[in-house]
Amino acid sequence: MQISELELAKDLIRKPSVTPKDAGAINLLAKNLRSIGFNCKIINFKNVKNLYAKLGKSYPNFCYAGHTDVVPPGNIKNWTINPFKPVVRNNKLIGRGANDMKASIACFVTAVSRFRNQNKNFKGSISLLITGDEEGIALNGTKRVVKYLKRKKEKINFCIVGEPTNPNKLG
């Protein structure tokens, strides 16, 4: 199955996942990942949904970490568009979480989908650790999931965080 990064990003933006409310973002992501062969585990801590999805069982395990939650949009009347109804204008995706970081997640999922189609005999694992608790006080997200994974003897060898936090151009 081929996943469209733009369509997945739009679908994620349509989920008003304001911390800590998930609004279905984690389930949408899990559904897409399952369609390309990932085993998905939704891990709930208090009122926060988290996702650990893994493709493959061997090592090394390369993990992508990110979050689906967004900060509150404030007064919707101050927006020129509904922040949870994505639009593409001048080749730019506009909507709550487009930059931080729903489009990044969609691009990674699409890249993995393409990689899987071209590398059927890949020896190793690819995983995603996605939380719904990054924009808030972050007590029930990544830190707790990592502890949970350690208890389950799950090892992550390499990890990239797709968070767009550096304002400087690199490369």
What are these language model-derived features?
Residues 1-96, 117-122:
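Acidic/His- and Gly-rich active-site-bordering loop/insert found
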Residues 91-107:
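Glycine/serine-rich anion-binding loops at beta->alpha junctions
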Residues 103, 107-110, 117-171:
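Fold-level recognition of mixed alpha/beta catalytic cores in primary-metabolism enzymes, strongest
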Residues 16, 100, 133:
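Conserved acidic functional residues
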Residues 10, 54, 87, 105, ...:
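Residues within alpha-helical segments
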Residues 3, 59-64, 97, 150-164:
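Short charge-dense sequence patches
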